[in-house]
Amino acid sequence: MKALDALNILSDLMASQRGLVTTARAEAVGVDRHALSRLERNGHIERVMSSVYRSCAAPSFREERVYAAWLALDRAVPAWERARDESDVVASRGTAAWLMELGELNPEPITFTSVERRQSARPGLRLVKASLVRGEIVQVSGIPTTSPERTVLDPLRDGEDESLVSNVLRDFLRDNPDSVVSNVREKVDEVATRCGHPAGYPLFEALLREAQL
């Protein structure tokens, strides 16, 4: 297959996925691995991570590695179709906080939560099995992501340093109305014992003090 023909075939698909395409999706539309290798050698596409390429005509973007990892976890299915799948993986923990610019949690390893047990041998990738409901999922730059409320709670449940979580909470409070904050206050206090505090400990207020609010 000629390079121009391969690029023409891939152009619409890549345009719908922020300039990215997986090897599996390329093969599904008739562009095999040899054609992809030629396109890469000739400077038409660039490898973002194993099995994921970006068009060199498309700009790189801040969330690129997270988006590429999300595509790679179900690499045969186009992004637009996955957006309707409630069982799909969802960016979570530090990765979700980083996507939403909440606090200073480390986004690595790139972390996704799924209601089903999933595994991946990809380095730098973490998959967590946990319950999720529709209201706990939002879209951030085209990536399914845990809601800000859930993103505050998950690090606490994981035993993350409370000083780091307090900064996530600080930025959450900046962007949310009092009605939402009241609900989060209750849920934060409910996990206090899991964080090693006695029953009834006002964890929400303690985090506010830590964040100097």
Where do the protein language model's features map onto the residues?
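Short gly/ser-rich loop at a beta-strand->alpha-helix junction or flexible surface loop bordering the NTP-binding
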Residues: 2-8, 15-147, 151-154, 158-186, ...
